Amino acid sequence: MMRDFVVVGLSHRTAPVEIREHLAVAPDRLEQELREIAANGRLDEALLISTCNRVELYVTSANPIAASQIAKDALAKRLPEAADDDVLYQERGIDVVRHIFRVASSLDSLVIGEPQILGQVKEAFDAAKGAGTMGTLLGRCFTQSFATAKRVRNETGIAEGTVSVSSIACELAKKIFGNLEGRRTLLIGAGEMGEAAARSLQQTGTNLHVINRSEERARALAESCAGRAVPYERLTTELADADVVIVSTASPKFILTPELMKSVVRSRRRRPLFIIDIAVPRDVDPRVANMDNVFVYDVDDLQQVAEENLAVRAREAALAERIIEEELDAFSAWRRSLELA
């Protein structure tokens, strides 16, 4: 019996960040998570993608109906009690291949044309290989998704002047103030997202302060972006002095809590503080948004800014969709050759 593809997942299109963060898996946990999912031996292959805007489990099996239920159960058990499992979507067969081609090419991203997703898909691919859950079908499917994404970038203008979640966060900060020049921006986190935000902020003339648990990483990033590194112990002082805060760490727990922010709010003397949280799981406790003169935005609040970018890319996205259908035909031909063999 021929094996077939199944994907079960959720994304920014089906679930808000307060649900997505419950399913998020840190990059260094992907392999272990896959081993646990595949432990019952009922799935032939498995691959897990986890980003700030999506969590998707790809599997193959000779019994796709049973595989769908296994994959759904693996994700649904981590949903919060208040969430309905209809936030999870499912695809089977060739629709799964089309879906991952679109995901890798950033056509299903919050920000169409953003460059980070391809690296995240490759990271998931490597984790599946490391976990021993990658086989012929997923291997070919994902390898071809990388080639498809490369064609889309090379043959369309979808990435011209491209923006990312991080740069949209900076765009939002500029919209709030009109101009960031001379304003103090505190960046908490010096990982990939933080680095992308720092690069965008560098062009605004803001007074950039970078804080990270690893002071060495904070210093390296600050020096490369004409900013200033600050010891983590000065977090509350920096929060008291900042005009805008962009936070993106890999912490599994909230970084900014009401308890921490209480003294910050008091010392600011009614001066408003704008916090943009681009981490998933979130770095800012939702209760912070209820505090006086504190305004919190999360990744879902970036949607409106992203949609302004979408109209510009609509024509290029149509060209990209044609490339995906061509690559899908090529993949289908490869599958048929396996059946004949």
Where are these regions (language model features)?
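Adenosine-phosphate binding glycine-rich loop
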Residues: 21-30, 262-341
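A glycine-rich (often HGG/GG-containing) alpha/beta subdomain
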Residues: 1-109
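Short active-site oxyanion
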Residues: 45, 206-209, 271-274
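Glycine/serine-rich phosphate-binding loop and adjoining beta1-alpha1 elements at the start
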Residues: 83-181
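Short glycine-/small-residue-rich Rossmann-like dinucleotide-binding loops
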Residues: 249-251, 279-280
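Glycine-rich phosphate/diphosphate-binding loop of Rossmann-like nucleotide-binding domains
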Residues: 170, 174-244
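Internal alpha-helical scaffold of NAD(P)-dependent oxidoreductase catalytic cores
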Residues: 65, 72-85, 132-133, 139-148, ...
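Rossmann-fold NAD(P) dinucleotide-binding segment
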Residues: 195, 238-243, 252-275
